Amino acid sequence: MTLSFVTRWRDELPETYTALSPTPLNNARLIWHNTELANTLSIPSSLFKNGAGVWGGEALLPGMSPLAQVYSGHQFGVWAGQLGDGRGILLGEQLLADGTTMDWHLKGAGLTPYSRMGDGRAVLRSTIRESLASEAMHYLGIPTTRALSIVTSDSPVYRETAEPGAMLMRVAPSHLRFGHFEHFYYRRESEKVRQLADFAIRHYWSHLEDDEDKYRLWFSDVVARTASLIAQWQTVGFAHGVMNTDNMSLLGLTLDYGPFGFLDDYEPGFICNHSDHQGRYSFDNQPAVALWNLQRLAQTLSPFVAVDALNEALDSYQQVLLTHYGERMRQKLGFMTEQKEDNALLNELFSLMARERSDYTRTFRMLSLTEQHSAASPLRDEFIDRAAFDDWFARYRGRLQQDEVSDSERQQLMQSVNPALVLRNWLAQRAIEAAEKGDMTELHRLHEALRNPFSDRDDDYVSRPPDWGKRLEVSCSS
């Protein structure tokens, strides 16, 4: 089958990119590809059998027109000016059978005009982390970019130490970022901001294109998508780590996996990025940061959208987030109805977990085994203060009984929203260390496991992290 590519970005937004081709690595070789995703995108299996090829930037497919995008942004709350694709190249936009498109973005593809002081490369460590994280999030049901392939090489790339150079093929319906809009707003080119908005509406919100109120309705939906995404992050214990405005997806996708982390111990102020000295991007601050970022996006639209309309959309953020978060947390607790004491029960559980540094994922998974008429629970052994747990658990079981639902029905619901497996940093690190020694077995094994996060397991993927894995420090270097 021949793949079809279109050039919408190149043709419609000529001042937002520089056209250039990838720079291949030395002795590049394909070490992993996403068979399921490739099948979904109708990619011929033969493309994965002829060396690095397009996956390593050594060849382009017919119709591809590679380019690096320019954007700007606020980093850690400070205006950083022009940024852009410093090591990534958008190879093309694949036209799918249903008329939608999928960006093929090659990360680690070499120097671009936006590389600044960087070398345009990515290392094997970071490409493995992003591939694992994006696929883990996808199978958790959270909107995200996807990973299609990883190529490693003999080219050394220097970070804290010399590491193998690598490339990741990332795919997404769009790589539109808040930072694209900021770039032209701060250059006082508001007409180009409007062109970006028109491009987004034309291709991703086409049902609004002929509405005279299209910009307000479109921005309201961007706010809603962002609020929904952040709510989902919070419910699974995901910390992004670097929520700069240039890392915010207009479509509400999880974008740019760097120093991310899933909670091990329940620690509301968890900071996964060791460069985040002030805790701006801590786990519990993510909802506030996302709103701040939306306010920066709204500012770029203010030359052609009424400020009252923008503020009205921003004002809806908290309620949308709380609604999504509340619905999912009630499901995680097994509540079939909404009762006034639900928030208090949840907050008391969180307080107990924080005091005891309970494992976030294991706690909710084990809670899924609760029988409403039995005081026995395997979760009890996870707590030192048994009396405090017993008190909470008795009131929790009383709440379950109000719903008049069988244990089996409720347990089935809870196990469908409380994963047994999340991508803990130590699991990724183990796969990385093996891959750096040339053994890809654990990389493939972990990828396969992450496809079924809600299935029961009895292996070390669902055990508590070892001592060495609890406080792994992760940086932005990639």
From Swiss-Prot:
InterPro entries: adnlytase_SelO, SelO. ATP binds at G84, G86, R87, K107, D119, G120, R170, R177, D256. It is an enzyme of class 2 (transferase). Mg(2+) binds at N247, D256. It catalyses: L-seryl-[protein] + ATP = 3-O-(5'-adenylyl)-L-seryl-[protein] + diphosphate; L-threonyl-[protein] + ATP = 3-O-(5'-adenylyl)-L-threonyl-[protein] + diphosphate; L-tyrosyl-[protein] + ATP = O-(5'-adenylyl)-L-tyrosyl-[protein] + diphosphate; L-histidyl-[protein] + UTP = N(tele)-(5'-uridylyl)-L-histidyl-[protein] + diphosphate. GO terms for molecular function: AMPylase activity; ATP binding; magnesium ion binding. The keyword Nucleotide-binding applies. Belongs to the SELO family. Nucleotidyltransferase involved in the post-translational modification of proteins. It can catalyze the addition of adenosine monophosphate (AMP) or uridine monophosphate (UMP) to a protein, resulting in modifications known as AMPylation and UMPylation. This is Protein nucleotidyltransferase YdiU. It comes from Escherichia coli O9:H4 (strain HS). The gene is ydiU.
